[in-house]
Design a protein with these regions (language model features):
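Right-handed parallel beta-helix
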Residues: 158, 178-179, 201-202, 220-221
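Leucine-rich repeat
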Residues: 1-189, 194
Length: 240
């Protein structure tokens, strides 16, 4: 019990410092190494500089260990800046699956043109926050067997490619979403785009397309940048 408590305390301390600093401190003792080896927060940044193959192999080794050991993952952040990113897609799919299977709560992906498997992501029942940057969301219609992600509370999409059906799918699949950010995304071509959510409290839209209609009776914060003033409906209908 004492060893487990010590490991938990060390892990909490590791979460307060950078990944690089935590790796250096892992050599202090077996307890520190064990805590380092089971960190719940994983953050990986891969650049297309010399030695990138070794970096990819390190990430792959770590994710295989987490997968085989079923080590819980609370946060998984992956940022890849690579010229020919498509060759890494199979690896990204594999790492993402490990994170989802291990109960990830916060998922952050920054990867140019990566076709994020959104239905697989939304099927994860423990996910609370989803942040996508530069990714592509596969076209999905409401008739495609969309799952409900009742745990998801926050979605942030920046420079993501998606269409109107995907936007509606996200709100339809996440009935308890509280915060939503849509920033300079492409693919939204309809002249009239509507956002409807009974749970949404914080909404940020930085887009220069479409005439927005926002129906969110619980909305308390709106940050909007666009060509048209949105139509707001924030009055809750009377039950009488």
């Amino acid at each position: 019990m004492a060893d487990l408590l010590l490991e938990c305390l060390i892990q909490k301390m590791f979460c307060l410092i950078s990944f690089k600093e935590a790796s250096k401190m892992s050599i202090l003792s077996k307890s520190w190494l064990q805590a380092w080896s089971t960190l719940p927060n994983l953050e990986f940044f891969v650049n297309c500089w010399q030695g990138w193959v070794a970096h990819i192999n390190i990430v792959d080794t770590i994710m295989e260990r987490y997968g085989k050991g079923k080590i819980p993952i609370e946060k998984f952040e992956l940022s890849v800046f690579f010229a020919d990113s498509t060759q890494l897609f199979p690896l990204i799919d594999k790492w993402l699956l490990v994170a989802l299977q291990n109960g990830v709560k916060e998922l952050i992906l920054h990867f140019t043109s990566y076709p994020a498997p959104i239905l697989t992501i939304l099927a994860e029942k423990s996910l609370r926050e989803l942040v996508l940057h530069d990714c592509t969301l596969m076209p999905v219609s409401l008739s495609s067997g969309v799952v409900s992600c009742n745990s998801l509370r926050k979605i942030s999409l920046s420079y993501v490619t998606l269409d109107e059906n995907m936007l509606q799918t996200l709100f339809y699949s996440c009935p308890f979403i509280v915060s939503f950010l849509l920033e300079y995304c492409s693919g939204l071509t309809m002249k009239h785009i509507k956002i409807k959510s009974d749970s949404l409290k914080v909404l940020k839209i930085h887009q220069y397309c479409g005439i927005w209609e926002i129906e969110a009776p619980d909305l308390v914060s709106l940050d909007y940048t666009g060509n048209e003033i949105p139509v707001l409906n924030i009055a809750r209908e009377s039950s009488q």
